[in-house]
Amino acid sequence: MTKYAFFKGQIVPIEQAKISIMNHAFNYGTGCFEGIRAYWNEREEQLYVFQMAPHYERLLRSCRLLMISLPYSVEKLSELTVELLRREGFREDAYVRPIAYKASELIGVRLHDLQDDFAMFAVPFGKYIEKEEGADAAVSSWRRVDDNAVPARGKITGSYVNAAFSKTEAVLNGFDEAIVLTQDGHVSEGSAENLFLVRDGRLITPPVTENILEGITRAMIIQLAREELGLVVEERPIDRTELYVADEAFFCGTGVQVAAIAHIDRRPVGSGRLGPIVKKIRDLYFAVVRGQVPKYKALCTPVYPK
């Protein structure tokens, strides 16, 4: 249960963290956000925030796109996050949601001459996709919004309506998740997750120029695949039909973590079950994020003093 929020420059009870119905971001989607995972390590009795600095670096880049000016550095944002999590006292996996937004209370679509603000809360959070052996995905009829319309490299609140359209279409049609194409028909990503394929032992993922989020988990997977598993990783455009001939496939992201894809458009991906390469990647990733791999321990920020 969430008890606190960072709001208007201080940590307050969650009930006090309220915005006006006239709030600009509430009316026009003029905000940006991050999702940051914190992982409970039972053996060490420690909560580790994973890759906090890269998330806040990306948040500040999103702020630049929306002309939002925050009075906080990456270091200060990280300190506030640890303080909030300590106050919450979580002894389980958690998810932190920082939001930067246009806080003026007025009517009028624009980014300039508006007040900016920042808020943050955290919630206990488990798996985003529950199926251990793999999700059932469908190629969506909704296309990813192009960079020169609403840039996907920014986590902009209003742009996630595009993700919501594809996700809900998939679920209403009996699937777990959507795969979205670009305007020219190449594979972009999931509704709100990056995507990888495995073909002939090679890991393949769309480049960041295919209107995808510049995923922090995506970059971590690429590093682990190359340096720890010795895999060849190709960042290149992916045709739709490659989805149907892939040996394995998976979604990745802070929320979804690493989630295998068992079927696409009701066609089995490989054996239709969790494949060996995805399993290796997933197992290694979860060991890293819980602070169990010494080489990557510096990416994990402890919450509780020892």
PLM regions with names:
Residues R86-F90:
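Non-catalytic accessory segments adjacent to catalytic cores
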Residues A103:
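Active-site loop/lid in soluble adenylation, ligation, and acyl-transfer enzymes
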